[in-house]
Amino acid sequence: MAKETFSIEFAGRTLTVETGQVAKQANGAVVVRYGDTTVLTAATMGKMATGDFFPLQVNYEEKMYAAGKFPGGFNKREARPSTDATLTARLIDRPIRPMFAEGFRNEVQVINTVLSYDENASGRVAAMFGSSLALAISDIPFDRPIAGVEVAYIDGEYIINPTVAEKEASSLELSVAGNINAINMVESGAKELSEEVMLGALLAGHNAVKELIEFQNEIVAKVGKEKAEVELLHVDEDLKAEVIAAYNSDLQKAVQIEEKLARESATKAVKEAIISVYSAKYENDENLSIILRDLAEILEGMEHAEVRRLITEDKIRPDGRKIDEIRPLDAEIDFTPRNITHGTGLFTRGQTQALSTLTLAPMNEAQIIDGLNDEYKKRFMHHYNFPQYSVGETGRYGAPGRREIGHGALGERALEQVLPSLEEFPYAIRLVAEVLESNGSSSQASICAGTLALMAGGVPIKAPVAGIAMGLISDGTNYTVLTDIQGLEDHFGDMDFKVAGTRDGITALQMDIKISGITPEILAEALAQAKTARFQILDVIEATIAQPREELAPSAPKIDTITIPVDKIKVVIGKGGEQIDKIIAETGVKIDIDDEGLCSIFSSDQAAIDRAKEIIAELVREAKVGEIYDAKVVRIESFGAFVNLFGKQDAMVHISEMAWARTENVEDVVKLGDTVKVKIMKIDDKGRVDASMRALVEKPEGYVEPERKPRERRENGDRRKGNGNSNRGNGFDRRNNDRNNQGNKVGNHSFELRERKSHIDEEFPELSTKKPE
């Protein structure tokens, strides 16, 4: 295949697609260039059908070279995918999965590799476009193209594929995907936006999606391959009819049992009995394994059909609820002792239960994110764990999988919209949700439990957040929207539409569907039902705890802040962290300083915080002209005295500024260690401070300033040379050498006394101690 190039202008950038040049052994491959972002997508298919499910794998690989960066770590090589890469892979998987035929069982891999990265041209948009197009032009049986875009909302306007600056200004971060006819994937975080605004964003996004799909269709028409003939899994229709006729009523009775565990037990017993009958019947048949495989599919289909029939025809749900009814709710705080943990919330909805635990820490404990974008600190983390015991099973135990990462991220988006600013609450915040029981909607239970934990822990959130999962049963013509779906309705339904928010608006959306797409009318109805349900849940949460506690838990670190000038940050930190380490060692606190000069001090001991704050204040304190100090004499020279104002800030009192009367000897007025009152008279551009004692004493009546003698010109023209003060000069050189050796060490305020001495000789020649030349 020869190289082909296609281009359009889309959302303010050039979108270019190249085919036929690279990865030619894959079933389908494209290079997508969007702005300066380049993504290579390759799609491949296994030769044979495998297993009893569709093994689709979508990867999104972030190569650090794409941003001109080295990977971190000892090996300097990309390792496991980042959280963002995992979420992007899920984002692509969800809209393309429904586009494969029922019964398709060949393994399919779609690998997206980011080759160059432009932060203002979304890699996930390019990868989703490339994934669909690589499948569409290949011989892999892919039903129809999909595409996705990002949507922002600024000042009442929807913006497609916003830049970084636009994202920062936006009250909405939405990813929406679909086919030419309908939306089939939604992922969003929002700052309490109304249902109407969110629906408008979805429609604006879908209109943009249609443009991308039309572009794909043009490319497929020119370079698309003929689709391969693959074997789809079809059950024996005679066997199906036989089983339904003999056992459908038994399975219906089991499915209609309202309590989950009893229903599961009864359903399992019916299925096992049927399998036992047919295992014995076909014991000697060489196709027994195929018969049993078909039988499992038939029984699953019978259960699927009965659940949907009950809902659409009888308007009865498996647990007996009405279509828009929420399961029984319960909320509790302080599940664990407050003198140990920082805040806990236990939320129960029917047989779904989540425990969320809050931990607060200094900002230096925040997660450092180093990906294709610039490194930054992530302040808020929401982690979701789903142990197998929550559904009464045994199973894999280990690192979180894609599902757990995705559910944690959804809760994070929902809750971060109501968190106080860093200035208001300078803590790193971690919530961990442990799913203790699950019968559907556990991610939304984790959001409700997280709200309880935040409020119980004293985090001043703007408003409580609740989440609800909406479902859909549709036959293509008629549909039913379900409120608060349970596991069976999720498994056999067509949609899982999660909506989280406050009383003022939506903070997060996530939608997965198993059909090709849903209409705006269904979305509007689902959002309206979700709002009603959300308010009911908020009633229960607010009845448990109406407002965030005013005090943190006794176990939580206390905090105080002090804002320091940006140019003083290095003073507090010190060379190699020497100064800040000294403060920490002396007081036992933790200190975090951001780039704006906000210094946060953490400790469980308020006295330690106060002491550290005092030390920092002294380090960054600056003398100002006109201020008066009780200063200690720390060094005496023939031309004046050096006094300490505070901390390491010294000032010089010239001999002429000690008294109104002429002073012949400095020590006639002050002694080393004396405390004297001085007034700041001048601060030069190098930060050297001149002070006066006599300025605080009333000038004697008839006082006349002594006449200044003109300065004699020296032949060599350099007032710093000569023999008059060699001994003292050498002493000054030692101080200056010390200063140079220390570099920029924080807090070193030693004076370059030789220059100061020359300055005095020049302005007050009558006081000069230099020998005449």
Swiss-Prot record:
UniProt-recorded Gene Ontology molecular function terms: 3'-5'-RNA exonuclease activity; magnesium ion binding; polyribonucleotide nucleotidyltransferase activity; RNA binding
Cofactors that this protein relies on: Mg(2+)
Start and end residues of each stretch annotated as Disordered: 700-773
Keywords carried by this UniProt record: Cytoplasm, Magnesium, Metal-binding, Nucleotidyltransferase, RNA-binding, Transferase
Domain of life: Bacteria
UniProt EC number: 2.7.7.8
Single Gene Ontology BP annotation: mRNA catabolic process
Cellular compartment(s): Cytoplasm
Lineage of origin: Bacteria, Bacillati, Bacillota, Bacilli, Lactobacillales
Keyword Lyase on entry: no
GO CC annotations, alphabetized: cytosol
Record-annotated S1 motif domain positions: 626-694
Similarity section: Belongs to the polyribonucleotide nucleotidyltransferase family.
Function: Involved in mRNA degradation. Catalyzes the phosphorolysis of single-stranded polyribonucleotides processively in the 3'- to 5'-direction.
Stated name of the protein: Polyribonucleotide nucleotidyltransferase
Primary location class: cytoplasm
